[in-house]
């Protein structure tokens, strides 16, 4: 009799916990659906009227300079290095989808006036212009040169001697379309992505007709000597031909972080047997 009562009690407990589990599962499902609907609702609540009003070219009222042009769902900057950015407006907030998304509180937006709070907490006042001459400000090309090698094909070759050895060394910087984005703040106090382009550098050394080295270098090839965090931010700017010694032919690879004073210089030595040694 005692065992029968225990078994009945156990069955009741099991049934109770099964009901609790079903209830929790159902509640989670309802909650999940609710969140999904809320997310969809938020997605639909973008202020399309505000987006329509912000279209056009905007001038900084204090400085008289061109701040940006909004066209469609994209903002374009007059600075040739600054990348165009997707934007959205929800309620009184402007969202910019940079590499690191940012948002700005809108104080006032009309057909011809925009006031918002920038990254420093300062109020920025802009006025829309209908002057078509400002369109030319946005019809620019990327600069051909900066403090780093950008968009330039650079070729070098030289003949060097070390003792009785005579070497023919080559170096060629090949531009690529691979972007390295660096976030900065423009004159209006708005975060913008500035785009720089990486390079691939080909080097070769010949002892007569024998190739000691003949290969491409990318910035990732130096990750053993340079921190990975820096590799992600830097450009392989150049590999220069330096000299020939008893050790071999010396090159220097220059890895530079755009818009900063930091760089790594890597010594590359190719010996008479084609062995490569790299040091900082």
Residue ranges of predicted features:
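Surface-exposed loop/turn elements that mediate protein-protein interactions on large endomembrane-trafficking
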Residues: 207-217, 270
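Surface-exposed loop and turn segments in beta-propeller and other repeat-based domains
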Residues: 213-231
């Amino acid at each position: 009799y005692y065992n029968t009562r225990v078994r009945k009690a156990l069955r009741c407990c099991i049934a109770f916990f099964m009901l609790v589990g079903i209830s929790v599962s159902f509640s989670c499902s309802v909650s999940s659906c609710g969140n999904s609907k809320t997310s969809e609702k938020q997605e639909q609540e973008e202020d399309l009227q505000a987006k329509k009003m912000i279209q056009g070219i905007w001038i900084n009222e204090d400085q008289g300079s061109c701040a940006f042009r909004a066209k469609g769902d994209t903002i374009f900057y007059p600075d040739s290095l600054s990348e165009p950015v997707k934007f959205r407006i929800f309620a009184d907030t402007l969202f910019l989808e940079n590499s690191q998304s940012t948002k700005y509180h809108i104080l006032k937006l009309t057909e011809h006036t925009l006031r918002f709070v920038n990254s420093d907490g300062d109020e920025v006042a802009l006025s829309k212009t209908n002057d078509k001459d400002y369109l030319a400000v946005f019809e620019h090309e990327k600069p051909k040169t900066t403090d780093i090698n950008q968009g330039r094909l650079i070729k070098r070759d030289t003949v060097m001697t070390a003792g009785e050895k005579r070497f023919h060394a080559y170096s060629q910087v090949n531009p690529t379309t691979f972007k390295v984005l660096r976030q900065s703040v423009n004159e209006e106090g708005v975060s913008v992505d500035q785009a720089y382009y990486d390079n691939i550098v080909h080097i070769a050394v010949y002892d007569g007709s024998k190739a000691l080295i003949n290969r491409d270098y990318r910035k990732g090839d130096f990750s053993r000597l340079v921190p990975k965090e820096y590799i992600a931010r830097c450009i392989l700017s150049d590999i220069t031909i330096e000299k020939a010694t008893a050790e071999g032919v010396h090159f220097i690879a220059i890895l530079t972080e755009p818009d900063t004073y930091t760089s790594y210089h890597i010594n590359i030595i190719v010996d008479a047997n084609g062995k490569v040694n790299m040091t900082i």
